[in-house]
């Protein structure tokens, strides 16, 4: 591999690593951000992480705002890695694009466009018009998996439902000896899914 190609490969690998961290940050806050999607953000300068941010509890502030607020260094010409397209409109918070432009961030990577029509695809143009390099689609499949429930809810106007059923190998739900057939591993998964959900529906007997 030539030096030029090697440098390109190294940059691409670093970009993926930074975005993986952003995705991990988003996943850690998933289910705790109200109606807003959980977003992760990493800011890098000279190949060094200088700040991170997540969507706040109940959805505010946004991850980009938190990452900028958390940073004590000059953000000029830094790179921002964010899991979802930054917002570009005024709502309960100012546009993240405005904050990015104001702080002279030089390059923005995001995994995928937001499904919200107020945002979708518009941030790309806004940032480019302000001389900020923009690249989208980095680790898009991972982001699609992370935002499956959010996109389903916005597109279908329906709740995203996860069903959990425990059965034994012989397809019996429980025996007279013991009603519990799950182990500690499956119990941990169940509690994790409950943590990431907005509501839980159970039978009266479960209580």
Place the predicted regions along the sequence by residue:
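Short beta-strand scaffold segments in enzyme catalytic cores
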Residues: 38-47, 164-166
């Amino acid at each position: 591999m030539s030096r030029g190609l090697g440098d390109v490969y190294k940059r691409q690998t670093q970009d993926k690593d930074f975005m993986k961290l952003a995705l991990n940050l988003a996943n850690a806050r998933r289910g705790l951000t109200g109606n807003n999607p959980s977003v992760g953000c990493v800011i890098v300068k000279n190949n060094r992480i200088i700040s991170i941010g997540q969507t706040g509890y109940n959805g505010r502030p946004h991850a980009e705002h938190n990452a900028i607020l958390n940073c004590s260094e000059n953000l000029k010409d830094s790179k921002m890695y964010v899991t979802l397209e930054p917002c570009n409109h005024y709502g309960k918070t100012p546009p993240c694009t405005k904050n990015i432009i104001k702080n002279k961030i030089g390059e923005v990577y995001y995994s995928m466009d937001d499904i919200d029509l107020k945002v979708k695809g518009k941030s790309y143009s806004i940032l480019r018009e302000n001389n900020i390099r923009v690249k989208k689609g980095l680790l898009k499949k991972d982001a699609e998996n992370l935002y499956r429930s959010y996109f389903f809810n916005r597109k279908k106007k329906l709740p995203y439902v996860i069903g959990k059923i425990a059965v034994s190998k012989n397809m019996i739900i429980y025996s007279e000896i013991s009603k519990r057939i799950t182990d500690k591993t499956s119990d941990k998964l169940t509690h994790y899914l409950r943590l990431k959900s907005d509501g839980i529906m159970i039978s009266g007997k479960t209580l």
